[in-house]
Every structure is written in structure tokens, then in C-alpha cells.
């Protein structure tokens, strides 16, 4: 089951205890999902692929208007999964009464392209309206893949009003036009979690948080591993350079010609090529800090550079002091 479907299934089980919230949720769903056809009579169509949502809208509609909508199930083509569910209400007067009661139309089927403030006057109604809108035309990506939640609308004015409802709860949705639709979206994981809390999807919220925490831990571990790998690569590259310098000195001058402090660090460097500067310093007698080890290795590098350039070593340059 997809993350979005699981979320909508949870929303469809939420009990509505107030008539104003029942009205707000139903108004949002019908406004965003409904379509009208006029063939002899007027028919209101609602469509969803989620049977739980179909049952909920049927139940809420019956509770609100004491009427039953007709439910039709349509099987999809062979290559497509699942079924499509249509909720149908027929009759010009009945449809007109429902749409005007829900503030979706004004007058005789004159569509209200925004959200009537009365529908979302209360905080609880704002929550219910967002819940209905999400069930109608909302989607949420699995957080394992990406952080993304969106709702689409046919009218920009309507989407702007929907965004204002979201902003009431201190959400900061983005907005874009996609083909013939307008889209409101959230990409910040914390804001998506807050949206789920607002619409009452608390189980989905916990699941989302769990995935988010695990994803964060994996990313942190990966960063640490990458950092360790990078540090190891730097250590290896530096170690190879040190060993090459030591070989140059040994072949052209002889390590025995070096002061004891430089001899010791040269021998330990060759014996422990994988050791970093801190570890190398701890192998010396007495132990030496990172800066001390680095200073000695730089002296060896300068000696090797002179031997490489001139073929001999001038003791007067002070590198052996």
C-alpha cells in the first residue's frame, strides 16, 4: 500500500463530532473533486480510487443531507490496478440545494471559485477543510524517497484561498502551475509533519517521523563514513609521499646519516604506512604530538627534494640540525 493511500485510509476513519466540521470537510471534497453533467437532468459526480474515501463521503453526505448518493464501481483496464468509485447525485433541485448549502455555488449553479470564509470560520473547520481537500486531491510521497506533499486545484483563486488556510497554521506552502492545474506543495519535512497533525493523520505522522529519523541517521552515518574514507585517502596519499621521500634519502644518503629523531620517524613511517600523524607520534619514544611529527616529516621532505634536485646533500643547509 502506498504511503498516500495509507494516510487517506486513516483520514477516512476519523470521527466528525461537529456539524460545522462535517460541512467543511464535505464542501472541500466536493469543491475539489466534483463535476457536473447536464443531460436532461443535472448530475453531480464524485470520483475516487480509494474505497475507504468513497464510503466516508457517502456516510458524511447521508448524515448531512439525509440523502444517499449512488455508488458505482468501475474496474480498470487489465494493465491498471485497482478500481474506480463514482458517487452520483441526480436531480437539478437536489444538486442545487447541496451545492448552495456547501457554499460551492451561488445562485443557479454559478460556481464560487474561492473558499467562502464562513466555511472555515472556526479553527476546527479549517482542519476539517484541509482534510477534505487532501482526501480529494492531495498526495504525499513516501519519505524514504523524498519529502513532498501537494494538493491540486482547477482554479488559482481557490488554491490561493486554500494556501491562506494553510498559512493560518503557520505553514509555508509553495505554489506552481502545472498544465491546467494549480499546485500547493510542502517540501520541508517538519512542515509536512505539522500538516499531517493538523488534518488528524496521527498514525501516519508517527510513521513519517520514524522514517524521517531513520533516514537522518542513515545520512549521518553515510556522512561519517564518507568523511572517514576521505581522511583515510588523505592519510594514504600523504603516507606514500613520505615513504617516497624516505626511500630517496635512504638510496642517496642513507638513513644512518640522519639525526636520531628523523631516523626514528622515518623507520616508523615505513613500518606503519596506514597510521595517521597522531598514531605515528604515539609510536615514537618518547611520544610526539601531531605538530612535532609533521615538523619532522617536512624536514625529511626538504632533504629528499634537495637530493632529488642536486644528487647530493649539503649539510650546511641546516636540515639536519
Curated annotation (Swiss-Prot):
GO molecular function ontology, one term from the record: DNA binding
Any GO BP: regulation of sporulation
Gene, per the UniProt record: whiA
Leader peptide range in chain numbering: none
Top-level taxon of the source organism: Bacteria
Pfam families attached to this UniProt entry: HTH_WhiA, LAGLIDADG_WhiA, WhiA_N
Function: Involved in cell division and chromosome segregation.
Lineage per the UniProt record: Bacteria, Bacillati, Bacillota, Clostridia, Natranaerobiales
Full protein name: Probable cell division protein WhiA
UniProt xrefs under Gene3D superfamilies: Homing endonucleases (3.10.28.10)
Ranges annotated as DNA-binding: 276-309
Family in the record: Belongs to the WhiA family.
SUPFAM superfamilies: Homing endonucleases (SSF55608)
InterPro entries in the record: Homing_endonucl, Sporu_reg_WhiA_N_dom, Sporulation_regulator_WhiA, Sporulation_regulator_WhiA_C, WhiA_LAGLIDADG_dom
Keywords attached to this entry: Cell cycle, Cell division, DNA-binding
Amino acid at each position: 500500500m502506498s504511503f498516500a493511500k495509507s494516510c487517506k485510509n486513516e483520514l477516512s476513519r476519523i470521527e466528525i463530532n461537529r456539524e460545522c466540521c462535517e460541512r467543511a470537510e464535505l464542501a472541500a471534497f466536493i469543491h475539489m473533486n466534483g463535476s457536473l453533467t447536464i443531460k436532461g437532468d443535472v448530475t453531480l459526480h464524485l470520483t475516487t480510487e480509494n474505497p475507504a474515501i468513497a464510503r466516508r463521503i457517502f456516510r458524511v453526505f447521508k448524515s448531512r443531507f439525509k440523502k444517499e448518493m449512488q455508488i458505482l464501481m468501475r474496474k480498470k483496464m487489465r494493465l491498471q490496478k485497482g478500481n474506480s468509485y463514482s458517487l452520483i447525485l441526480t436531480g437539478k433541485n437536489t444538486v442545487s440545494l447541496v451545492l448552495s448549502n456547501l457554499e460551492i455555488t451561488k445562485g443557479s449553479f454559478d460556481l464560487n471559485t474561492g473558499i467562502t470564509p464562513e466555511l472555515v470560520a472556526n479553527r476546527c473547520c479549517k482542519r476539517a477543510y484541509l482534510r477534505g481537500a487532501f482526501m480529494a486531491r492531495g498526495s504525499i510521497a513516501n519519505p524514504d524517497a523524498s519529502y513532498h506533499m501537494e494538493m491540486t486545484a482547477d482554479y488559482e483563486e481557490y488554491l490561493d484561498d486554500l494556501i491562506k488556510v494553510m498559512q493560518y497554521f503557520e505553514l509555508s506552502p509553495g505554489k506552481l502551475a502545472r498544465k491546467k492545474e494549480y499546485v500547493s506543495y510542502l517540501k520541508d519535512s517538519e512542515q509536512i509533519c505539522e500538516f499531517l497533525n493538523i488534518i488528524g493523520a496521527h498514525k501516519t505522522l508517527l510513521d513519517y517521523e520514524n522514517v524521517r529519523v531513520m533516514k537522518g541517521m542513515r545520512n549521518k552515518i553515510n556522512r561519517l563514513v564518507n568523511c572517514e574514507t576521505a581522511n583515510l585517502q588523505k592519510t594514504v596519499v600523504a603516507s606514500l609521499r613520505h615513504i617516497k621521500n624516505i626511500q630517496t634519502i635512504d638510496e642517496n644518503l642513507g638513513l644512518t646519516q640522519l639525526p636520531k629523531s628523523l631516523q626514528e620517524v622515518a623507520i616508523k613511517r615505513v613500518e606503519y604506512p596506514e597510521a595517521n600523524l597522531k598514531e605515528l607520534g604515539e609510536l615514537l619514544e618518547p611520544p610526539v604530538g601531531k605538530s612535532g611529527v609533521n615538523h619532522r616529516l617536512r624536514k625529511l621532505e626538504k632533504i629528499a627534494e634537495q637530493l632529488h634536485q642536486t644528487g647530493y646533500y649539503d649539510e650546511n643547509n641546516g636540515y639536519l640540525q
